[in-house]
Structures are given as C-alpha cells and as structure tokens.
Amino acid sequence: MEQDILEGKRILVVDDEHDVLDTVEDLLSMCEVTTASDFGRARDLLEADTFDLALLDIMGVDGYGLLELAVEKGIPAVMLTAHALSLDNIKKSREMGASYFIPKEEMVHLTTFLRDIFEARA
C-alpha cells in the first residue's frame, strides 16, 4: 500500500473560528497540525518553527500578512475563507504567492486539495 503523501506533514492552521480549527485537525489527523487563532500567535509560530504548509484564513487574522511571512520562509500557503471569496481576493492571494485558495464550504475536500499541492511540488 502506498504511503499517504500527507502522512506526518507539519501543517500550521490559522483561523479565528475554533470550530474551523477543530474540523481541520480532524480532517488532517494524519498530519502534525499546529493551530493558532490570532495573528500574533501565528506570526510567532511562523518565525520560530518550520512547516510543510500553512493554511490561512483571510479574514479575522490578517491572512495576507501571514501569507507574506509564509512566502518569505518558503512555506507553501493555502488561503481559506468563507466570506472573502471574490475575484479580487483570489487574484491578490495568487499575486502574493498563495499556492491555492479554498472556500470553507469545500473543506470536506481539504485532504484532496492538499495532496494535489504536495504531489505537484514533489
């Protein structure tokens, strides 16, 4: 049986909604997930640690500021949002270096999206 490409990946998940953090932790049980619910904590984690990927909420936690930090550290970043799904936000995320943009309504497919990202980078 082929090993899951997500197995053991270190993922930083940042969202100000604790139910979203819990859901992502459940969905990514094969990964080492670290969570943060505010910009300051997420910034500290990004500066002090190494992650294979950062999953960042756009609204509520200054996702664009965190995206900039992740890109500077060479950490692939995926933008996650429920309310900021607009062409401008998608464009800005891509221009700033985001690897992917996932609406929260599509979180059920999160593992598929992340596998695709890691396979494309392999």
Identify the role of each PLM range.
Residues 1-12, 108-122:
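Non-catalytic signal-transmission and effector/linker regions of two-component phosphorelay proteins
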Residues 23-27, 45, 69, 92:
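Alpha-helical interaction/dimerization surfaces of two-component signaling modules
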Residues 15:
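Conserved acidic carboxylate
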Residues 65, 84-103, 108, 112:
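Alpha4 helix (beta4-alpha4-beta5 surface) of REC/receiver domains from two-component response regulators
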Residues 80-82:
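Hydrophobic/aromatic residues positioned on beta-strands within the core alpha/beta folds
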Residues 18, 35-53, 61:
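Acidic, metal-coordinating helix/loop segments flanking the phosphotransfer/catalytic sites
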Residues 18-34:
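Two-component/phosphorelay signaling modules centered on CheY-like receiver
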Residues 59, 64-76:
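Short amphipathic alpha-helix used as the core "switch/output" element in two-component signaling
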